[in-house]
Regions:
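Alpha-helical transmembrane-bundle signature of multi-pass membrane transport and export proteins
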Residues: 1-393
Length: 393
């Protein structure tokens, strides 16, 4: 949030430059996700999350110092975006694998709901604060505040006292090489219809959502003439929406069925962005409409996130959690750099309104893929845990 807004509002970055900045920050997903999955299955997730939080705090702290010294131009932003992106890849894979090591499988939905709810709470104030700091004070101050929040996360995770169980390879087998473990994760995901559908649906969503967000961050300040504070406030509405989605995820799937919830929530959450290109002006009505759009998107996208995570964790053996999460991130989130670049290209060629409409329509491919897959037929209970032994790692 801070780096893209700084590029647009302070450096007057164009659509192509903003697309490139977002793509550089997302490129580590393609470069590191699969390796991160292999590491996570052999390390304590708490250790990895602590180290990566410390690294992100240091990187953004360095950006703050560079900004105060007048060195924070686009090249420096690209470096910081890449470093923070690389560390975030490892953190996210470890985060997704951590819960299975800490709770029983029948508590996964409730546990994911609680975890994602706490993460959503951070989204309520984060974007608004970041936008306000960039707009009212300066980008270095905003970067320093982000560094402080990562440091706070570092301290919080260090306080986790419960000991996690690390999956061990069979003693009779030599530990496999990293690339062999990566191949095992890929093969497991491709061989499971539900997981492979999650991959494809995630790829479709992330590709078009990245394009939407690149155009969105140009459309709000330039076409609608919104300040950085107003942009941050609009994006912050995703937070309370996601908090509501986390609470609903603990109840709705068991009442209406996991498949019904996945498909309908994805269609509603993704489809709401189709209303944004119709907005004009910077009136209070426009800001209110943006708040509603982001709230609805946050609610239903989080409902999908928590439900998908519970399904994935249930059908995956304990010793494969990191690699399966990383494979899905690689296929899904790996599309974001290309989507960001596409958003920049479309905005320059067609303008922001048309580009936003096309990219938002593309997001509906994700629920369509889920509707045509076995995921749509999931009932009110999670699938049975796998009995297949995990390949030695």
């Amino acid at each position: 949030m801070v780096l893209p807004l700084f590029a647009v509002l302070t450096l007057n970055a164009g659509a192509g430059e903003l697309g490139a900045l977002r793509a550089v920050g997302q490129a580590p997903i393609l470069l590191l996700s699969l390796l991160a999955g292999a590491w996570v299955d052999r390390w304590r997730t708490r250790t990895l999350m602590v180290l990566t939080d410390a690294g992100r705090a240091l990187a953004l702290g360095a950006a703050a110092v560079a900004g105060l010294l007048g060195w924070l131009g686009l090249p420096a932003l690209l470096v910081v975006a890449f470093v923070v992106g690389a560390l975030s890849v490892v953190f996210d894979v470890a985060y997704q694998a951590s819960l299975v090591r800490l709770v029983q499988r029948d508590q996964l939905v409730r546990g994911n709901s609680a975890l994602e709810g706490s993460r959503s709470a951070a989204q309520i104030g984060g974007p608004a604060l970041g936008g306000a700091l960039v707009s009212v004070l300066s980008a270095p101050i905003a970067a320093a505040s982000s560094a402080a929040f990562f440091a706070l996360s570092f301290l919080s995770i260090r306080r986790i006292g419960r000991r996690e169980t690390i999956p061990e390879p069979e003693r009779s087998e030599r530990p496999a090489r990293v690339w062999r473990r990566i191949h095992e994760g890929l093969r497991f995901v491709v061989g499971d219809t539900s997981l492979w559908t999650v991959c494809l649906a995630s790829a479709a969503f992330q590709f078009f959502f990245a394009a939407v967000m690149t155009v969105y961050l140009l459309f709000l300040p330039r076409d609608l003439q919104l300040s950085g504070t107003a942009v941050g406030l609009a994006l912050a509405a995703t937070g309370p929406g996601a908090l509501l989605g986390s609470l609903l995820a603990a109840r709705l799937p068991s009442r209406f069925g996991y498949g019904t919830v996945l498909v309908s929530a994805a269609a509603l959450g993704d489809g709401v962005f189709l209303f944004v290109p119709a907005l004009h002006g910077s009136s209070a009505v426009t800001v209110l409409a943006l708040l509603m759009v982001n709230f609805v998107f946050g609610t239903f996208s989080q409902l999908v996130n928590v439900t998908v995570m519970a399904v994935r964790q249930t059908v995956t053996p304990d010793g494969m959690q990191g690699r399966v999460a990383a494979t899905i991130n690689f296929v899904g989130m790996g599309m974001t750099p290309f989507g960001s670049l596409l958003g920049g290209v479309l905005a320059e060629a067609w303008g922001t309104r048309t580009s936003l409409l096309v990219a938002a329509a593309g997001m509906l491919l994700s629920p369509a893929l889920m509707a045509l897959s076995p995921l749509a037929r999931l009932g009110r209970t999670l699938p049975a845990p796998p009995d297949t032994p995990v390949p030695s790692a």
